[in-house]
Structure formats: C-alpha cells, structure tokens
Amino acid sequence: AGLTKRSLFDPSCTGVFDRQLLRRLRRVCDDCFNVFREPNVSTECRSNCYNNEVFRQCMEYLLPPHLHEEHRLAVQMVGK
C-alpha cells in the first residue's frame, strides 16, 4: 500500500514520504502553472522530485525569500 500511496503523489520522490511536504512542493508547481499557463511548467516543475531549475524559478518567483531555504530542504528530504 505504501508504494501506491507514494505514487499518487510523486513517483520520482524516493526519500522521506511526507505528505505535507509533498503537498507544499506540489502547490508551488500548481501555483506556477496557474500564473504562467504553460502546459509543460507543471510537469517539468515536478520532474526529478522537484529538484530542477523550473521548480527553483517558480519558488523564487512565488515565495518570499525567507521561505526558499525551507523549500530547498524539503526537496532534499523527499528526494533521493
């Protein structure tokens, strides 16, 4: 069941399975998609478990600087 639950979130994330962290990271991608309306933003933002340039750009664009480090750490935790 763990694997199914995990894959409902983001199959590329093989680190800590933390629903809240994953939800927060996904929200950055969703908000980014809503702002830019580029079809590939959502997919690219989630690729490699959020450890990518698109996610970083979305985060810098959408989030106040004091939250950047927190999100970077979250990416490391849920990633490999």
Swiss-Prot record:
SUPFAM superfamilies: Crustacean CHH/MIH/GIH neurohormone
Gene3D superfamilies, alphabetized: Crustacean CHH/MIH/GIH neurohormone
Modified residues (Valine amide): 78
One cellular component (GO) term of this entry: extracellular region
Pfam families found in the cross-reference section: Crust_neurohorm
Secreted keyword on record: yes
Organs and tissues of expression: Produced by the medulla terminalis X-organ in the eyestalks and transported to the sinus gland where they are stored and released.
Gene Ontology BP annotations: circadian rhythm; glucose metabolic process; neuropeptide signaling pathway
UniProt keyword list: Amidation, Carbohydrate metabolism, Cleavage on pair of basic residues, Disulfide bond, Glucose metabolism, Hormone, Neuropeptide, Secreted
GO MF, any single term: neuropeptide hormone activity
Compartments where found: Secreted
Main subcellular localisation: secreted
Disulphide bridges: 13-49, 29-45, 32-58
Superkingdom of origin organism: Eukaryota
Role this protein plays: Hormone found in the sinus gland of isopods and decapods which controls the blood sugar level. Has a secretagogue action over the amylase released from the midgut gland. May act as a stress hormone and may be involved in the control of molting and reproduction.
PANTHER family, sorted: ION TRANSPORT PEPTIDE, ISOFORM C (PTHR35981:SF2)
Family: Belongs to the arthropod CHH/MIH/GIH/VIH hormone family.
Name under which the protein is recorded: Crustacean hyperglycemic hormones
Species of the source: Penaeus vannamei
